[in-house]
Swiss-Prot record:
<dbReference type="InterPro" id="IPR004275">
    <property type="entry name" value="Frog_antimicrobial_propeptide"/>
</dbReference>
<keyword id="KW-0391">Immunity</keyword>
<feature type="signal peptide">
    <location>
        <begin position="1"/>
        <end position="22"/>
    </location>
</feature>
<comment type="similarity">
    <text>Belongs to the frog skin active peptide (FSAP) family. Aurein subfamily.</text>
</comment>
<feature type="compositionally biased region" description="Basic and acidic residues">
    <location>
        <begin position="38"/>
        <end position="48"/>
    </location>
</feature>
<keyword id="KW-0027">Amidation</keyword>
<feature type="modified residue" description="Isoleucine amide">
    <location>
        <position position="66"/>
    </location>
</feature>
<keyword id="KW-0165">Cleavage on pair of basic residues</keyword>
<keyword id="KW-1053">Target membrane</keyword>
<keyword id="KW-0044">Antibiotic</keyword>
<keyword id="KW-0732">Signal</keyword>
<dbReference type="GO" id="GO:0045087">
    <property type="term" value="P:innate immune response"/>
</dbReference>
<dbReference type="GO" id="GO:0016020">
    <property type="term" value="C:membrane"/>
</dbReference>
<keyword id="KW-0929">Antimicrobial</keyword>
<keyword id="KW-0964">Secreted</keyword>
<keyword id="KW-0878">Amphibian defense peptide</keyword>
<dbReference type="GO" id="GO:0005576">
    <property type="term" value="C:extracellular region"/>
</dbReference>
Length: 70
């Protein structure tokens, strides 16, 4: 009977340890995904700002050339 108790405790302990390791890896993966998502959002914002600057420069050149023609 004592042998069965020890075996059962060992199985439960190993199960809890493996479950704990899986949960830790899952949390790390979620944190990595959140960081990647934040980085992608920042890159998108920078691209939009860069595009806006280009459009603004082109509009300025067009307005300047129209003003010179008058």
């Amino acid at each position: 009977m004592a042998f069965l108790k020890k075996s059962l405790f060992l199985v439960l302990f190993l199960g809890l340890v493996s479950l704990s390791i899986c949960e830790k890896e899952k949390r790390q993966n979620e944190e990595d995904e959140d960081e990647n998502e934040a980085a992608n959002h920042e890159e998108g914002s920078e691209e939009k700002r860069g595009l806006f600057d280009i459009v603004k420069k082109i509009a300025g050149h067009i307005a300047g050339s129209i003003g010179k023609k008058r």
